[in-house]
Protein backbone atom coordinates (compact mmCIF):
# COMPACT_ATOMS: atom_id res chain seq x y z
CA UNK A 1 0.00 0.00 0.00
CA UNK A 2 1.38 3.44 -0.94
CA UNK A 3 1.58 6.29 1.56
CA UNK A 4 -0.85 8.33 -0.57
CA UNK A 5 -3.29 5.43 -0.49
CA UNK A 6 -2.83 5.19 3.28
CA UNK A 7 -3.85 8.83 3.73
CA UNK A 8 -6.88 8.38 1.48
CA UNK A 9 -7.76 5.20 3.37
CA UNK A 10 -7.41 7.02 6.70
CA UNK A 11 -9.87 9.68 5.58
CA UNK A 12 -12.30 6.98 4.48
CA UNK A 13 -11.91 5.04 7.73
CA UNK A 14 -12.52 8.14 9.87
CA UNK A 15 -15.79 8.72 8.03
CA UNK A 16 -17.18 5.31 9.00
CA UNK A 17 -18.29 3.70 12.25
CA UNK A 18 -15.62 1.93 14.27
CA UNK A 19 -16.78 -1.65 14.90
CA UNK A 20 -14.08 -2.11 17.55
CA UNK A 21 -11.64 -4.87 18.31
CA UNK A 22 -12.80 -8.38 17.56
CA UNK A 23 -10.82 -11.60 17.68
CA UNK A 24 -10.88 -14.57 15.34
CA UNK A 25 -12.09 -17.74 17.03
CA UNK A 26 -11.86 -21.30 15.70
CA UNK A 27 -15.38 -22.55 15.19
CA UNK A 28 -17.46 -25.30 13.70
CA UNK A 29 -17.91 -25.31 9.93
CA UNK A 30 -21.41 -26.10 8.77
CA UNK A 31 -22.40 -23.35 6.44
CA UNK A 32 -25.03 -22.79 3.84
CA UNK A 33 -24.95 -25.32 1.00
CA UNK A 34 -25.15 -24.52 -2.66
CA UNK A 35 -23.48 -22.20 -5.14
CA UNK A 36 -25.18 -19.47 -7.12
CA UNK A 37 -22.87 -20.30 -10.05
CA UNK A 38 -23.05 -24.10 -9.89
CA UNK A 39 -23.72 -26.09 -13.07
CA UNK A 40 -27.25 -26.82 -11.85
CA UNK A 41 -27.95 -23.17 -11.04
CA UNK A 42 -26.64 -21.95 -14.41
CA UNK A 43 -28.64 -24.60 -16.28
CA UNK A 44 -31.75 -23.35 -14.49
CA UNK A 45 -30.90 -19.78 -15.53
CA UNK A 46 -30.34 -20.90 -19.12
CA UNK A 47 -33.77 -22.51 -19.24
CA UNK A 48 -35.36 -19.35 -17.91
CA UNK A 49 -33.44 -17.26 -20.46
CA UNK A 50 -34.65 -19.46 -23.31
CA UNK A 51 -38.23 -18.82 -22.18
CA UNK A 52 -37.71 -15.06 -22.48
CA UNK A 53 -40.03 -13.71 -25.17
CA UNK A 54 -37.64 -10.97 -26.33
CA UNK A 55 -35.18 -12.79 -28.63
CA UNK A 56 -32.47 -10.13 -28.34
CA UNK A 57 -32.68 -10.20 -24.53
CA UNK A 58 -32.54 -14.01 -24.56
CA UNK A 59 -29.35 -13.92 -26.65
CA UNK A 60 -27.61 -11.43 -24.34
CA UNK A 61 -28.75 -13.31 -21.24
CA UNK A 62 -27.23 -16.50 -22.64
CA UNK A 63 -23.91 -14.68 -23.23
CA UNK A 64 -23.94 -13.31 -19.68
CA UNK A 65 -24.66 -16.77 -18.24
CA UNK A 66 -21.82 -18.22 -20.32
CA UNK A 67 -19.48 -15.54 -18.92
CA UNK A 68 -20.41 -16.62 -15.38
CA UNK A 69 -19.76 -20.24 -16.37
CA UNK A 70 -16.29 -19.23 -17.63
CA UNK A 71 -15.73 -17.27 -14.38
CA UNK A 72 -15.42 -14.05 -16.38
CA UNK A 73 -17.45 -12.14 -13.84
CA UNK A 74 -16.46 -8.71 -15.13
CA UNK A 75 -17.90 -9.56 -18.55
CA UNK A 76 -21.05 -11.00 -16.98
CA UNK A 77 -21.44 -7.81 -14.94
CA UNK A 78 -21.05 -5.64 -18.04
CA UNK A 79 -23.55 -7.66 -20.10
CA UNK A 80 -26.12 -7.66 -17.28
CA UNK A 81 -25.82 -3.89 -16.87
CA UNK A 82 -26.35 -3.38 -20.61
CA UNK A 83 -29.54 -5.41 -20.43
CA UNK A 84 -30.74 -3.42 -17.42
CA UNK A 85 -30.09 -0.14 -19.22
CA UNK A 86 -32.65 -1.30 -21.78
CA UNK A 87 -35.08 -2.86 -19.30
CA UNK A 88 -34.59 -2.30 -15.58
CA UNK A 89 -37.39 -4.78 -14.83
CA UNK A 90 -35.55 -7.73 -16.37
CA UNK A 91 -35.31 -9.99 -13.31
CA UNK A 92 -32.89 -12.50 -14.87
CA UNK A 93 -30.41 -9.71 -15.60
CA UNK A 94 -30.57 -8.63 -11.95
CA UNK A 95 -29.97 -12.24 -10.90
CA UNK A 96 -26.90 -12.56 -13.16
CA UNK A 97 -25.57 -9.20 -11.94
CA UNK A 98 -26.01 -10.37 -8.34
CA UNK A 99 -24.08 -13.58 -9.00
CA UNK A 100 -21.24 -11.74 -10.77
CA UNK A 101 -20.85 -9.23 -7.96
CA UNK A 102 -21.06 -11.88 -5.26
CA UNK A 103 -18.23 -13.77 -6.96
CA UNK A 104 -16.03 -10.66 -7.05
CA UNK A 105 -16.64 -9.94 -3.35
CA UNK A 106 -18.92 -6.93 -3.85
CA UNK A 107 -21.39 -8.30 -1.33
CA UNK A 108 -23.39 -5.14 -0.60
CA UNK A 109 -24.09 -4.46 -4.27
CA UNK A 110 -24.79 -8.15 -4.85
CA UNK A 111 -27.35 -8.15 -2.04
CA UNK A 112 -29.21 -5.22 -3.63
CA UNK A 113 -29.21 -6.94 -7.02
CA UNK A 114 -30.55 -10.18 -5.53
CA UNK A 115 -33.34 -8.24 -3.83
CA UNK A 116 -34.29 -6.65 -7.15
CA UNK A 117 -34.35 -10.08 -8.80
CA UNK A 118 -36.48 -11.48 -5.98
CA UNK A 119 -39.07 -8.76 -6.52
CA UNK A 120 -39.24 -9.30 -10.29
CA UNK A 121 -38.90 -13.04 -10.94
CA UNK A 122 -41.95 -15.31 -10.76
CA UNK A 123 -39.85 -18.30 -9.55
CA UNK A 124 -38.60 -16.85 -6.27
CA UNK A 125 -37.05 -20.02 -4.85
CA UNK A 126 -33.55 -20.02 -6.40
CA UNK A 127 -33.08 -16.28 -5.82
CA UNK A 128 -34.19 -16.63 -2.20
CA UNK A 129 -31.66 -19.44 -1.76
CA UNK A 130 -28.85 -17.33 -3.24
CA UNK A 131 -29.87 -14.36 -1.10
CA UNK A 132 -29.92 -16.51 2.01
CA UNK A 133 -26.43 -17.86 1.35
CA UNK A 134 -25.07 -14.37 0.79
CA UNK A 135 -26.74 -13.01 3.93
CA UNK A 136 -25.36 -15.98 5.89
CA UNK A 137 -21.88 -15.31 4.52
CA UNK A 138 -22.22 -11.65 5.53
CA UNK A 139 -23.05 -12.71 9.12
CA UNK A 140 -26.71 -11.71 8.83
CA UNK A 141 -28.36 -14.94 10.08
CA UNK A 142 -31.77 -13.42 10.80
CA UNK A 143 -32.09 -12.24 7.21
CA UNK A 144 -30.65 -15.53 5.95
CA UNK A 145 -33.25 -17.52 7.91
CA UNK A 146 -36.08 -15.57 6.28
CA UNK A 147 -34.75 -16.21 2.78
CA UNK A 148 -34.06 -19.90 3.48
CA UNK A 149 -37.60 -20.31 4.83
CA UNK A 150 -38.85 -18.71 1.60
CA UNK A 151 -36.72 -21.14 -0.42
CA UNK A 152 -38.16 -24.11 1.47
CA UNK A 153 -41.70 -23.06 0.62
CA UNK A 154 -40.78 -23.53 -3.04
CA UNK A 155 -38.74 -26.71 -2.42
CA UNK A 156 -39.95 -28.32 0.84
CA UNK A 157 -38.16 -31.66 0.26
CA UNK A 158 -34.80 -30.16 -0.69
CA UNK A 159 -31.81 -31.23 1.46
CA UNK A 160 -30.01 -27.97 0.74
CA UNK A 161 -32.97 -25.93 1.97
CA UNK A 162 -33.27 -27.86 5.24
CA UNK A 163 -29.54 -27.69 5.92
CA UNK A 164 -29.31 -23.98 5.22
CA UNK A 165 -32.30 -23.05 7.35
CA UNK A 166 -30.93 -25.15 10.24
CA UNK A 167 -27.55 -23.40 9.96
CA UNK A 168 -29.18 -19.98 10.17
CA UNK A 169 -31.36 -21.02 13.13
CA UNK A 170 -28.27 -22.35 14.91
CA UNK A 171 -26.53 -18.97 14.51
CA UNK A 172 -29.62 -17.31 15.98
CA UNK A 173 -29.39 -19.57 19.08
CA UNK A 174 -32.65 -21.24 18.05
CA UNK A 175 -31.20 -24.72 18.41
CA UNK A 176 -34.42 -26.57 19.19
CA UNK A 177 -35.97 -25.30 15.95
CA UNK A 178 -32.84 -26.26 14.02
CA UNK A 179 -32.99 -29.78 15.45
CA UNK A 180 -36.64 -30.16 14.41
CA UNK A 181 -35.84 -29.06 10.85
CA UNK A 182 -32.94 -31.52 10.66
CA UNK A 183 -34.85 -34.44 12.20
CA UNK A 184 -37.58 -34.09 9.60
CA UNK A 185 -35.07 -33.81 6.76
CA UNK A 186 -33.08 -36.81 7.99
CA UNK A 187 -36.25 -38.87 8.18
CA UNK A 188 -36.61 -38.38 4.44
CA UNK A 189 -32.88 -38.33 3.62
CA UNK A 190 -31.00 -40.56 6.11
CA UNK A 191 -28.01 -40.87 3.75
CA UNK A 192 -27.37 -37.11 3.61
CA UNK A 193 -23.99 -36.71 5.34
CA UNK A 194 -24.28 -32.94 5.36
CA UNK A 195 -27.40 -33.08 7.55
CA UNK A 196 -25.70 -35.30 10.15
CA UNK A 197 -22.79 -32.87 10.20
CA UNK A 198 -25.03 -29.86 10.73
CA UNK A 199 -26.91 -31.68 13.49
CA UNK A 200 -23.58 -32.28 15.21
CA UNK A 201 -22.75 -28.56 15.09
CA UNK A 202 -26.08 -27.70 16.69
CA UNK A 203 -25.27 -30.03 19.60
CA UNK A 204 -21.81 -28.45 19.89
CA UNK A 205 -23.53 -25.09 20.22
CA UNK A 206 -25.48 -26.24 23.26
CA UNK A 207 -22.43 -27.80 24.90
CA UNK A 208 -23.14 -31.47 24.14
CA UNK A 209 -19.77 -32.33 22.62
CA UNK A 210 -20.04 -36.04 23.39
CA UNK A 211 -23.44 -36.24 21.70
CA UNK A 212 -22.23 -34.29 18.69
CA UNK A 213 -19.43 -36.79 17.99
CA UNK A 214 -22.03 -39.51 17.33
CA UNK A 215 -23.41 -37.41 14.47
CA UNK A 216 -20.00 -36.44 13.08
CA UNK A 217 -19.07 -40.14 13.08
CA UNK A 218 -22.23 -40.95 11.10
CA UNK A 219 -21.49 -38.15 8.66
CA UNK A 220 -17.99 -39.56 8.07
CA UNK A 221 -19.33 -43.09 7.70
CA UNK A 222 -21.53 -41.86 4.88
CA UNK A 223 -18.88 -39.56 3.37
CA UNK A 224 -15.36 -40.64 4.47
CA UNK A 225 -13.67 -37.60 2.86
CA UNK A 226 -16.07 -34.99 4.26
CA UNK A 227 -13.63 -32.37 5.53
CA UNK A 228 -16.18 -30.30 7.46
CA UNK A 229 -17.14 -33.32 9.57
CA UNK A 230 -13.48 -33.99 10.43
CA UNK A 231 -12.98 -30.36 11.40
CA UNK A 232 -16.11 -30.29 13.52
CA UNK A 233 -15.26 -33.55 15.27
CA UNK A 234 -11.91 -31.96 16.12
CA UNK A 235 -13.80 -29.03 17.61
CA UNK A 236 -15.96 -31.37 19.73
CA UNK A 237 -12.91 -33.31 20.89
CA UNK A 238 -11.29 -30.10 22.08
CA UNK A 239 -14.35 -29.48 24.25
CA UNK A 240 -13.77 -32.93 25.76
CA UNK A 241 -10.06 -32.28 26.34
CA UNK A 242 -8.98 -34.82 23.67
CA UNK A 243 -6.37 -32.51 22.14
CA UNK A 244 -4.18 -35.06 20.32
CA UNK A 245 -7.25 -36.63 18.70
CA UNK A 246 -8.47 -33.16 17.76
CA UNK A 247 -5.19 -32.43 15.98
CA UNK A 248 -5.45 -35.68 14.00
CA UNK A 249 -8.98 -34.79 12.89
CA UNK A 250 -8.00 -31.24 12.00
CA UNK A 251 -5.12 -32.43 9.82
CA UNK A 252 -7.44 -34.98 8.16
CA UNK A 253 -9.85 -32.15 7.38
CA UNK A 254 -7.10 -30.10 5.74
CA UNK A 255 -6.45 -32.84 3.17
CA UNK A 256 -9.69 -32.16 1.30
CA UNK A 257 -11.13 -28.75 2.22
CA UNK A 258 -14.37 -27.70 0.62
CA UNK A 259 -13.31 -24.11 -0.03
CA UNK A 260 -10.39 -21.71 0.53
CA UNK A 261 -12.25 -20.24 3.52
CA UNK A 262 -12.74 -23.70 5.03
CA UNK A 263 -9.01 -24.40 4.64
CA UNK A 264 -8.10 -21.07 6.25
CA UNK A 265 -10.32 -21.80 9.25
CA UNK A 266 -8.83 -25.29 9.55
CA UNK A 267 -5.29 -23.88 9.42
CA UNK A 268 -6.11 -21.37 12.14
CA UNK A 269 -7.74 -24.07 14.25
CA UNK A 270 -4.63 -26.23 13.82
CA UNK A 271 -2.47 -23.36 15.08
CA UNK A 272 -4.46 -23.05 18.29
CA UNK A 273 -4.49 -26.84 18.79
CA UNK A 274 -0.69 -26.94 18.50
CA UNK A 275 -0.49 -24.18 21.11
CA UNK A 276 -2.88 -26.08 23.39
CA UNK A 277 -0.56 -29.10 23.11
CA UNK A 278 2.42 -26.99 24.20
CA UNK A 279 4.04 -27.18 20.75
CA UNK A 280 4.51 -23.45 21.01
CA UNK A 281 7.09 -22.83 18.28
CA UNK A 282 5.05 -24.74 15.70
CA UNK A 283 1.89 -23.07 16.94
CA UNK A 284 3.18 -19.54 16.50
CA UNK A 285 4.47 -20.37 13.03
CA UNK A 286 1.00 -21.64 12.07
CA UNK A 287 -0.64 -18.66 13.82
CA UNK A 288 0.14 -16.48 10.80
CA UNK A 289 -2.97 -18.09 9.29
CA UNK A 290 -5.04 -15.66 11.40
CA UNK A 291 -4.48 -13.11 8.62
CA UNK A 292 -5.40 -15.36 5.70
CA UNK A 293 -7.26 -13.36 3.01
CA UNK A 294 -9.66 -16.30 2.75
CA UNK A 295 -10.94 -15.67 6.31
CA UNK A 296 -13.81 -13.20 6.12
CA UNK A 297 -13.20 -12.11 9.75
CA UNK A 298 -9.46 -11.56 9.27
CA UNK A 299 -8.53 -7.87 9.22
CA UNK A 300 -7.13 -6.25 6.10
CA UNK A 301 -4.50 -3.83 7.40
CA UNK A 302 -4.56 -0.46 5.65
CA UNK A 303 -0.98 0.31 6.64
CA UNK A 304 1.81 1.35 4.24
CA UNK A 305 5.46 0.39 4.32
CA UNK A 306 7.44 -2.76 5.04
CA UNK A 307 6.00 -5.31 7.44
CA UNK A 308 8.62 -6.43 9.97
CA UNK A 309 9.79 -10.00 9.48
CA UNK A 310 12.55 -10.57 12.02
CA UNK A 311 15.04 -7.80 11.19
CA UNK A 312 17.23 -6.30 13.94
CA UNK A 313 15.26 -3.50 15.61
CA UNK A 314 18.12 -1.69 17.35
CA UNK A 315 17.76 2.02 16.60
CA UNK A 316 14.83 1.50 14.23
CA UNK A 317 11.54 3.38 13.99
CA UNK A 318 8.67 0.94 14.31
CA UNK A 319 4.88 1.17 14.10
CA UNK A 320 2.87 -1.62 15.80
CA UNK A 321 -0.85 -2.21 15.66
CA UNK A 322 -2.48 -4.39 18.27
CA UNK A 323 -4.76 -7.13 16.99
CA UNK A 324 -7.58 -9.58 17.66
CA UNK A 325 -10.05 -8.80 20.45
CA UNK A 326 -9.72 -6.36 23.31
CA UNK A 327 -8.47 -9.04 25.70
CA UNK A 328 -5.85 -10.14 23.16
CA UNK A 329 -4.62 -6.55 22.83
CA UNK A 330 -3.95 -6.51 26.57
CA UNK A 331 -2.54 -10.06 26.68
CA UNK A 332 -0.11 -9.51 23.79
CA UNK A 333 1.08 -6.28 25.46
CA UNK A 334 3.01 -8.71 27.67
CA UNK A 335 5.72 -8.31 24.98
CA UNK A 336 5.86 -4.51 24.82
CA UNK A 337 8.62 -4.04 27.44
CA UNK A 338 10.77 -6.49 25.45
CA UNK A 339 10.05 -4.68 22.16
CA UNK A 340 10.93 -1.29 23.67
CA UNK A 341 14.17 -2.80 24.97
CA UNK A 342 14.96 -4.27 21.54
CA UNK A 343 14.55 -0.84 19.90
CA UNK A 344 17.04 0.64 22.35
CA UNK A 345 17.49 4.29 23.35
CA UNK A 346 17.83 5.45 19.74
CA UNK A 347 14.75 3.59 18.51
CA UNK A 348 11.18 4.83 18.32
CA UNK A 349 7.83 3.08 18.71
CA UNK A 350 4.37 4.19 17.63
CA UNK A 351 1.62 1.94 18.99
CA UNK A 352 -1.98 1.80 17.71
CA UNK A 353 -4.41 0.40 20.30
CA UNK A 354 -8.17 0.29 20.84
CA UNK A 355 -9.02 3.89 21.79
CA UNK A 356 -10.36 2.94 25.25
CA UNK A 357 -6.94 1.49 26.13
CA UNK A 358 -4.93 4.55 25.07
CA UNK A 359 -4.69 6.31 28.50
CA UNK A 360 -3.50 3.11 30.20
CA UNK A 361 -0.81 2.48 27.58
CA UNK A 362 0.30 6.13 27.52
CA UNK A 363 0.87 6.07 31.28
CA UNK A 364 2.73 2.75 31.18
CA UNK A 365 4.94 3.61 28.20
CA UNK A 366 5.54 7.38 28.33
CA UNK A 367 8.21 7.29 25.58
CA UNK A 368 5.94 5.44 23.16
CA UNK A 369 3.68 7.35 20.78
CA UNK A 370 0.23 5.87 21.49
CA UNK A 371 -2.55 6.35 18.96
CA UNK A 372 -5.91 4.73 18.30
CA UNK A 373 -6.51 2.21 15.57
CA UNK A 374 -9.87 2.08 13.87
CA UNK A 375 -11.67 -0.98 12.54
CA UNK A 376 -14.51 -0.89 10.04
CA UNK A 377 -16.67 -3.53 8.41
CA UNK A 378 -17.34 -3.04 4.71
CA UNK A 379 -19.10 -5.42 2.34
CA UNK A 380 -18.49 -8.46 4.50
CA UNK A 381 -14.83 -7.69 5.21
CA UNK A 382 -12.95 -6.16 8.14
CA UNK A 383 -10.40 -3.38 7.66
CA UNK A 384 -8.03 -1.90 10.26
CA UNK A 385 -6.10 1.35 9.92
CA UNK A 386 -4.27 3.86 12.10
CA UNK A 387 -5.96 6.97 10.67
CA UNK A 388 -4.47 9.50 13.09
CA UNK A 389 -0.92 8.83 11.87
CA UNK A 390 -0.11 11.30 9.09
CA UNK A 391 3.63 10.95 8.51
CA UNK A 392 4.31 7.35 7.47
CA UNK A 393 7.71 8.09 5.93
CA UNK A 394 9.37 8.12 9.36
CA UNK A 395 8.90 4.37 9.95
CA UNK A 396 11.35 1.64 8.97
CA UNK A 397 8.82 -1.14 9.61
CA UNK A 398 5.30 -1.83 10.77
CA UNK A 399 4.06 -4.98 12.51
CA UNK A 400 1.02 -6.58 14.05
CA UNK A 401 1.92 -7.19 17.69
CA UNK A 402 1.46 -10.95 17.32
CA UNK A 403 4.33 -10.98 14.80
CA UNK A 404 6.71 -10.94 17.79
CA UNK A 405 5.35 -14.08 19.44
CA UNK A 406 7.69 -16.57 17.67
CA UNK A 407 10.84 -14.66 18.63
CA UNK A 408 9.92 -13.29 22.07
CA UNK A 409 7.72 -16.13 23.40
CA UNK A 410 8.98 -19.30 21.65
CA UNK A 411 8.17 -21.48 24.70
CA UNK A 412 5.99 -21.21 27.78
CA UNK A 413 9.19 -20.91 29.81
CA UNK A 414 10.20 -17.81 27.82
CA UNK A 415 7.45 -15.73 29.45
CA UNK A 416 8.82 -13.33 32.06
CA UNK A 417 7.68 -13.65 35.65
CA UNK A 418 6.93 -9.94 35.99
CA UNK A 419 3.78 -9.62 38.07
CA UNK A 420 2.40 -6.64 36.14
CA UNK A 421 3.16 -4.90 32.87
CA UNK A 422 0.49 -2.17 32.73
CA UNK A 423 0.29 0.70 35.23
CA UNK A 424 -3.13 1.84 36.45
CA UNK A 425 -3.79 5.41 37.57
CA UNK A 426 -2.58 5.48 41.21
CA UNK A 427 -5.08 8.19 42.18
CA UNK A 428 -7.98 6.10 40.87
CA UNK A 429 -6.64 2.98 42.58
CA UNK A 430 -6.63 4.93 45.86
CA UNK A 431 -10.18 6.15 45.15
CA UNK A 432 -11.48 2.64 44.61
CA UNK A 433 -9.67 1.27 47.64
CA UNK A 434 -11.37 3.94 49.74
CA UNK A 435 -14.77 3.02 48.29
CA UNK A 436 -14.18 -0.67 48.93
CA UNK A 437 -13.15 -0.05 52.54
CA UNK A 438 -16.61 1.44 53.17
CA UNK A 439 -18.14 -1.96 52.38
CA UNK A 440 -16.83 -3.43 55.61
CA UNK A 441 -14.33 -6.16 56.49
CA UNK A 442 -13.41 -9.16 54.38
CA UNK A 443 -11.64 -9.60 51.05
CA UNK A 444 -13.09 -7.68 48.12
CA UNK A 445 -13.57 -10.12 45.24
CA UNK A 446 -14.40 -9.01 41.71
CA UNK A 447 -16.68 -11.24 39.63
CA UNK A 448 -16.78 -11.87 35.87
CA UNK A 449 -19.07 -14.53 34.44
CA UNK A 450 -19.53 -13.91 30.71
CA UNK A 451 -18.31 -12.16 27.59
CA UNK A 452 -20.12 -9.30 25.87
CA UNK A 453 -19.94 -11.05 22.48
CA UNK A 454 -21.73 -14.23 23.50
CA UNK A 455 -23.36 -16.26 20.77
CA UNK A 456 -24.39 -19.83 21.59
CA UNK A 457 -21.11 -21.26 20.34
CA UNK A 458 -19.10 -19.09 22.75
CA UNK A 459 -21.69 -19.38 25.54
CA UNK A 460 -20.76 -23.03 26.08
CA UNK A 461 -17.37 -21.76 27.36
CA UNK A 462 -19.07 -20.04 30.31
CA UNK A 463 -20.84 -21.57 33.29
CA UNK A 464 -24.54 -20.72 33.74
CA UNK A 465 -24.79 -18.12 36.46
CA UNK A 466 -26.87 -20.25 38.85
CA UNK A 467 -23.92 -22.65 39.16
CA UNK A 468 -21.98 -19.87 40.91
CA UNK A 469 -24.06 -20.51 44.04
CA UNK A 470 -21.34 -22.34 46.06
CA UNK A 471 -18.88 -19.55 45.27
CA UNK A 472 -21.33 -16.78 46.18
CA UNK A 473 -22.16 -18.45 49.50
CA UNK A 474 -18.56 -18.13 50.71
CA UNK A 475 -18.77 -16.42 54.13
CA UNK A 476 -16.83 -13.27 54.91
CA UNK A 477 -16.38 -12.17 51.28
CA UNK A 478 -17.55 -8.89 49.71
CA UNK A 479 -18.39 -9.42 46.04
CA UNK A 480 -17.82 -6.65 43.51
CA UNK A 481 -19.35 -6.57 40.05
CA UNK A 482 -16.74 -6.15 37.31
CA UNK A 483 -18.98 -7.60 34.59
CA UNK A 484 -19.64 -5.22 31.71
CA UNK A 485 -22.78 -5.34 29.59
CA UNK A 486 -26.30 -6.16 30.73
CA UNK A 487 -26.03 -8.10 33.99
CA UNK A 488 -29.02 -6.84 35.99
CA UNK A 489 -30.74 -10.22 35.75
CA UNK A 490 -27.80 -12.10 37.30
CA UNK A 491 -27.29 -9.53 40.06
CA UNK A 492 -31.00 -9.65 40.90
CA UNK A 493 -30.88 -13.47 40.94
CA UNK A 494 -27.96 -13.40 43.38
CA UNK A 495 -29.84 -11.07 45.72
CA UNK A 496 -33.35 -12.51 45.48
CA UNK A 497 -32.63 -16.23 45.11
CA UNK A 498 -29.31 -16.63 46.92
CA UNK A 499 -29.44 -13.76 49.39
CA UNK A 500 -26.07 -12.43 48.18
CA UNK A 501 -25.42 -8.75 47.50
CA UNK A 502 -23.02 -8.03 44.63
CA UNK A 503 -21.80 -4.46 44.99
CA UNK A 504 -22.21 -2.27 41.92
CA UNK A 505 -19.47 0.38 41.66
CA UNK A 506 -20.90 3.81 40.90
CA UNK A 507 -19.56 6.43 38.53
CA UNK A 508 -17.90 4.00 36.13
CA UNK A 509 -18.88 2.49 32.80
CA UNK A 510 -17.40 -1.01 33.00
CA UNK A 511 -17.38 -1.31 29.22
CA UNK A 512 -16.13 2.13 28.18
CA UNK A 513 -13.93 3.43 31.04
CA UNK A 514 -11.16 0.85 30.70
CA UNK A 515 -8.48 2.97 32.38
CA UNK A 516 -10.71 3.24 35.44
CA UNK A 517 -11.62 -0.46 35.17
CA UNK A 518 -7.91 -1.28 35.37
CA UNK A 519 -7.67 0.84 38.53
CA UNK A 520 -10.70 -0.90 40.06
CA UNK A 521 -9.16 -4.29 39.23
CA UNK A 522 -5.97 -3.22 40.98
CA UNK A 523 -7.97 -2.16 44.04
CA UNK A 524 -9.78 -5.46 44.68
CA UNK A 525 -8.07 -8.35 46.47
CA UNK A 526 -9.01 -11.06 43.97
CA UNK A 527 -10.83 -11.48 40.66
CA UNK A 528 -12.74 -14.67 39.78
CA UNK A 529 -14.00 -15.34 36.30
CA UNK A 530 -13.62 -16.52 32.76
CA UNK A 531 -11.25 -15.04 30.23
CA UNK A 532 -12.65 -11.80 28.87
CA UNK A 533 -11.34 -8.26 28.37
CA UNK A 534 -11.60 -7.27 32.04
CA UNK A 535 -9.86 -10.33 33.42
CA UNK A 536 -6.97 -9.59 31.06
CA UNK A 537 -6.77 -6.07 32.48
CA UNK A 538 -6.74 -7.54 36.00
CA UNK A 539 -3.88 -9.86 35.05
CA UNK A 540 -1.94 -7.07 33.36
CA UNK A 541 -2.02 -4.91 36.52
CA UNK A 542 -1.01 -7.89 38.69
CA UNK A 543 -4.23 -8.64 40.59
CA UNK A 544 -4.58 -12.24 41.88
CA UNK A 545 -7.02 -14.17 39.68
CA UNK A 546 -8.94 -17.43 39.88
CA UNK A 547 -9.52 -18.14 36.18
CA UNK A 548 -12.04 -20.71 34.97
CA UNK A 549 -10.83 -22.27 31.74
CA UNK A 550 -11.54 -25.19 29.42
CA UNK A 551 -9.41 -28.31 29.19
CA UNK A 552 -8.09 -27.32 25.75
CA UNK A 553 -7.65 -23.57 26.20
CA UNK A 554 -4.79 -22.66 23.85
CA UNK A 555 -3.74 -19.61 25.87
CA UNK A 556 -2.37 -21.91 28.62
CA UNK A 557 0.14 -23.15 26.00
CA UNK A 558 -0.07 -26.74 27.21
CA UNK A 559 0.63 -25.87 30.86
CA UNK A 560 -1.46 -26.04 34.01
CA UNK A 561 -0.86 -22.35 34.66
CA UNK A 562 -1.30 -19.13 32.65
CA UNK A 563 2.02 -17.98 31.20
CA UNK A 564 0.77 -14.50 30.29
CA UNK A 565 -0.04 -13.51 33.90
CA UNK A 566 1.86 -14.98 36.88
CA UNK A 567 -0.97 -13.86 39.20
CA UNK A 568 -3.45 -16.34 37.66
CA UNK A 569 -4.45 -19.63 39.24
CA UNK A 570 -6.26 -21.84 36.71
CA UNK A 571 -9.34 -23.92 37.45
CA UNK A 572 -9.71 -26.26 34.51
CA UNK A 573 -13.04 -27.84 33.63
CA UNK A 574 -12.58 -31.19 31.94
CA UNK A 575 -15.66 -30.80 29.74
CA UNK A 576 -17.75 -27.79 28.74
CA UNK A 577 -21.25 -28.19 30.06
CA UNK A 578 -20.05 -29.96 33.23
CA UNK A 579 -19.20 -27.01 35.47
CA UNK A 580 -20.34 -28.20 38.89
CA UNK A 581 -17.03 -29.83 39.95
CA UNK A 582 -15.06 -26.80 38.81
CA UNK A 583 -17.28 -24.33 40.66
CA UNK A 584 -16.96 -26.51 43.76
CA UNK A 585 -13.15 -26.31 43.59
CA UNK A 586 -13.33 -22.53 43.14
CA UNK A 587 -15.59 -22.25 46.19
CA UNK A 588 -13.14 -24.28 48.29
CA UNK A 589 -10.20 -22.16 47.13
CA UNK A 590 -12.11 -18.96 47.89
CA UNK A 591 -12.88 -20.13 51.43
CA UNK A 592 -9.18 -20.78 51.93
CA UNK A 593 -8.34 -17.36 50.46
CA UNK A 594 -10.84 -15.61 52.73
CA UNK A 595 -9.47 -17.42 55.78
CA UNK A 596 -5.83 -16.59 55.03
Curated annotation (Swiss-Prot):
The keyword Iron does not apply. InterPro entries: TPR-like_helical_dom_sf, TPR_rpt, Ycf3. Gene3D superfamilies: Glycogen Phosphorylase B, Tetratricopeptide repeat domain. Pfam families: TPR_19, TPR_8. Keywords: Bacterial flagellum biogenesis, Repeat, TPR repeat. It comes from the Bacteria. GO terms for biological process: bacterial-type flagellum organization. TPR repeats lie at residues 91-124, 159-192, 193-226, 228-260. This is Protein FlbA.
Amino acid sequence: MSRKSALESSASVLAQADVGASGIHPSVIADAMGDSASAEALERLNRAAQDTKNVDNAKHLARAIQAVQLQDYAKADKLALKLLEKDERLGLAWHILAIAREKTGDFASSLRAYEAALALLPDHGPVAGDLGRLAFRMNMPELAAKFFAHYRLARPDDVEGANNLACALRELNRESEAIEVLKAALGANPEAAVLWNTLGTVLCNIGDAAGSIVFFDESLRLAPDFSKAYHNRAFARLDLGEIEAALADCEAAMRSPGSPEDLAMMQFARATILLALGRVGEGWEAYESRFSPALSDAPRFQIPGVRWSGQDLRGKRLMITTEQGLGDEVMFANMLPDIVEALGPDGFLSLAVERRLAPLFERTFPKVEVTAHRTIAYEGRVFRAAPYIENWDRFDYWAAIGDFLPSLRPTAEAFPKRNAFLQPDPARVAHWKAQLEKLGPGPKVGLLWKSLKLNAERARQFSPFHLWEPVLHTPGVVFVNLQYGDCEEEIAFAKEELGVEIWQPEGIDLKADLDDVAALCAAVDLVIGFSNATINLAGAVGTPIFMLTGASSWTRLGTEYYPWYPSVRCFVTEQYGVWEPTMGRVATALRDFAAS
